[in-house]
């Protein structure tokens, strides 16, 4: 499960990895010369973002609010690979999680770090004080070794 912030107290967990938002730009975009881009530099861009029914959208919108940006949104989608394709065609820029961006990267896009960013944690979680099934206990033991 992906968490932005802390895992709720009622759960135990094993953290597998962390992830962060990055900027996805067409490879010929003028900001690709920078290794890190302040979000404020994207204020005049047209965005292609993940849809409003995702946790990513809530966090992304908070990043915009925290930097005083009202994004111009051309398109919202559900699939990171489609968003990356549209960015690669020059239809706009995007903010996506680094792992999505790296997995679906094409020569037509460039990935850049942003400031500020938001970090997520990908974890296996289970309820505290609740016995695990034998299969779940075996799986958990396997992961912990």
Regions found by a protein language model. Name each.
Residues 49, 75, 93-94:
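Conserved SAM-binding loop
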Residues 65-74, 108-109:
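A local structural motif
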Residues 1-9, 70, 76-79:
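Central regulatory/effector-binding core of bacterial HTH transcription factors
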Residues 25, 35, 60, 105, ...:
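Short, flexible helix/strand-to-coil boundary loops that buttress conserved ligand/catalytic motifs
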Residues 3, 45-67, 132-140:
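Secondary-structure junction motif
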Residues 10-52, 119-130, 140, 144:
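Hydrophobic/proline-rich hinge and linker segments of small-molecule sensing/allosteric domains
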Residues 38, 59-60, 82, 120, ...:
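Hydrophobic alpha-helical segments typical of transmembrane helices
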Residues 6-20, 34-35, 81-128:
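Beta-alpha-beta core module
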């Amino acid at each position: 499960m992906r968490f932005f912030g802390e895992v709720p107290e009622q759960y135990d967990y094993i953290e597998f990895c962390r992830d962060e938002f990055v900027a996805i730009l067409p490879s010929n975009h003028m900001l690709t010369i920078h290794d890190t881009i302040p979000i404020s530099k994207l204020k005049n861009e047209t965005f292609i973002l993940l849809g409003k029914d995702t946790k990513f959208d809530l966090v992304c919108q908070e990043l915009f609010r925290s930097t005083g940006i009202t994004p111009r949104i051309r398109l919202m989608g559900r699939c990171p690979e489609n968003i990356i394709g549209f960015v690669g065609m020059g239809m706009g820029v995007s903010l996506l999680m680094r792992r999505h961006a790296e997995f679906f990267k094409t020569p037509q896009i460039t990935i850049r770090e942003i400031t500020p960013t938001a970090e997520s944690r990908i974890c296996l979680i289970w309820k505290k004080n609740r016995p695990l099934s034998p299969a779940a206990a075996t799986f958990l033991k396997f992961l912990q070794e």
